[in-house]
Amino acid sequence: MTLLALGINHKTAPVSLRERVVFSQDKLGVALDSLLQQPLVQGGVVLSTCNRTELYLSVDEQENQREQLIRWLCEYHQLRPEEVNSSLYWHQGNAAVSHLMRVASGLDSLVLGEPQILGQVKKAFAESQRGHSLSSELERLFQKSFTVAKRVRTETDIGASAVSVAFAACTLARQIFESLADVTVLLVGAGETIELVARYLRDHNVQKMVIANRTRERAQALATEVGAEVITLAELDEQLVHADIVISSTASTLPIIGKGMMERTLKARRNQPMLMVDIAVPRDIEPEVGKLPNVYLYSVDDLHAIIQHNLAQRKAAAVQAESIVQQESSDFMAWLRAQSAVETIRDYRAQADELRAEMTAKALAAIQQGNDVEAVIQELTHRLTNRLIHAPTKSLQQAARDGDQNRLQILRDSLGLD
């Protein structure tokens, strides 16, 4: 058995490719079932966010395991291997362990140290738990990674400055508009990222916010909290005309705002400029919208420059965090190596117990037949000793014949002779 991590993220692929390998939440169970039908896969977790899609797996080691897993990924998403091969990364053993710990701790995020990723990792883990898709090794690894993330959060200043994709979107809005108090903001979606954006905007005196969502019920609690109006996606077309800023993050698999819709909006607005920030993957806003006059469209990838500006405070803390990850990954690998001996130890103990039971039964039978107790005990200990030392003696003799001094020393250590 070996642990693997196979993935694609914001560092290796643009959003145009990442959105094609997203696993939608409502079909994640189906994907896990399909993944576990692969003969080499013992357990799996699928992590799919706007910035990464990753498979964490425990597998039976095979020569072509990489090719098998990439083939499954491509077939599932109807992609050709040559479309993704150069963007995929592959980690095995300790590298896979360290990678997950870094991801859970926010050390591999677009925004260094951002806390949202830990919740996303926990959600992916819970989905695999519900689907009984975890091996014992994989379950232990994820639990350990949650502990590591907590250590990083409490023992370093990695989360001291509040930066995230949501924060970056709001920073962009503040850079473009002198005052957010006088603008109308339309938020599309009601998920975690939009919640963060809405709270940030409220704290920066945005007076007019509208939340558009597929259902009013999901958005109403957030709207009440931040003082926003709620509309459905069906009302989006007529509401866009009033929006100076649009920030969108839904789980839709197709664009919600298209070029035609925006052409009508701009005409009604008499070409007043609009800032549009699309932080969804797959994208909510058709890329062609960005080519329209007076529309300033930014995607997740465009936020990268803004985010880089906020990294300086976290880099020193990241060095300390990496040290924690290195220590914890080494400890986990030591535990994992020890597990390979568990079955051998179990078999050895079972063999010894079987021998003890056999010898005891013979001794008791001899005593019941009237044989001298002391003589029976002497015979018992003699036979038990011979049986116990038989296999080690043969191994010692073979090591001596082979001239294998290392094996001889290992056997001496195992037998407690030194």
Curated annotation (Swiss-Prot):
Substrate binds at residues 49-52, 109, 114-116, 120. This is Glutamyl-tRNA reductase. Possesses an unusual extended V-shaped dimeric structure with each monomer consisting of three distinct domains arranged along a curved 'spinal' alpha-helix. The N-terminal catalytic domain specifically recognizes the glutamate moiety of the substrate. The second domain is the NADPH-binding domain, and the third C-terminal domain is responsible for dimerization. Catalyzes the NADPH-dependent reduction of glutamyl-tRNA(Glu) to glutamate 1-semialdehyde (GSA). One of its GO terms (biological process) is protoporphyrinogen IX biosynthetic process from glutamate. It comes from Pectobacterium atrosepticum (strain SCRI 1043 / ATCC BAA-672) (Erwinia carotovora subsp. atroseptica). Signal peptide: none annotated. Pathway: Porphyrin-containing compound metabolism; protoporphyrin-IX biosynthesis; 5-aminolevulinate from L-glutamyl-tRNA(Glu): step 1/2. The gene is hemA. HAMAP family: Glu_tRNA_reductase.
